[in-house]
């Protein structure tokens, strides 16, 4: 286990665990946050504590020896990918946000919700800020537009399911943890060359550009 006393440090544990699970050695590793909110797990009688880490590795071919596979984080956060312009699911997203804003109990709350949604999702006169990944996820959670928000509520109605924005859910609060990691890496690549931890030994400038764009979720100016 990552936290066993046999490991020399809190970073060596996750490194060894990740390699056993995937066969991949990690380069850059950074501890993020500790997550322990009781309502995030759907279990009222227990608290699950998760210590999260961001680890980078180079892409390699998948091995049948391990029960692991590569996934794009945009499978879980399709609204974060603006490389080809506004995502195709933007209409569903705007509709859900509009209903949440309209359902506010009073004018002040309605105005606050509208301003918050506009700032986080680049609506009205606001520009898209790629670093606000966690804040966008938390807003969608609050607006009950993702499945994780309804866990523990019993059977989910068809109306509620129809309101969900696209994006694969994850167990417990793992999508929230992933959002934290994405936000951290997007901010990190702006002032530290960690992107090279993801690149092969030899690469072209175009490959480097494509990697940065994939992380940032938007095109970069050459």
Enumerate the predicted regions with their spans:
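Hydrophobic, aromatic-enriched interface-forming segments
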Residues: 80-179
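Short, positively charged loop/turn segments that connect secondary-structure elements
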Residues: 213-222
């Amino acid at each position: 286990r990552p936290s066993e006393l046999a490991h020399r440090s809190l970073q060596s544990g996750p490194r060894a665990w990740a390699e056993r699970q995937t066969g991949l050695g990690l380069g850059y590793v950074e501890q993020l946050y500790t997550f322990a909110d009781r309502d995030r797990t759907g279990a009222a009688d227990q608290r699950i504590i998760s210590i999260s880490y961001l680890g980078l590795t180079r892409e390699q071919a998948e091995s049948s020896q391990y029960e692991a596979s590569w996934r794009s984080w945009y499978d879980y956060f399709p609204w974060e990918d603006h490389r080809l312009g506004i995502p195709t699911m933007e209409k569903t997203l705007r509709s859900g946000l509009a209903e949440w804003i309209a359902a506010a109990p009073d004018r002040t709350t309605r105005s606050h919700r509208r301003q918050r949604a506009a700032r986080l999702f680049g609506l009205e006169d606001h520009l898209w800020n790629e670093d606000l990944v966690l804040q966008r996820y938390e807003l969608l959670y609050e607006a009950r537009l993702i499945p994780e928000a309804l866990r523990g509520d019993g059977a989910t109605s068809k109306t509620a399911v129809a309101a969900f924005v696209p994006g694969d859910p994850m167990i417990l609060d793992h999508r929230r943890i992933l959002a934290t990691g994405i936000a951290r890496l997007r901010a990190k690549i702006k002032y530290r060359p960690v992107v090279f931890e993801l690149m092969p030994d030899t690469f072209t400038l175009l490959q480097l550009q494509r990697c940065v764009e994939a992380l940032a979720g938007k095109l970069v100016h050459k």
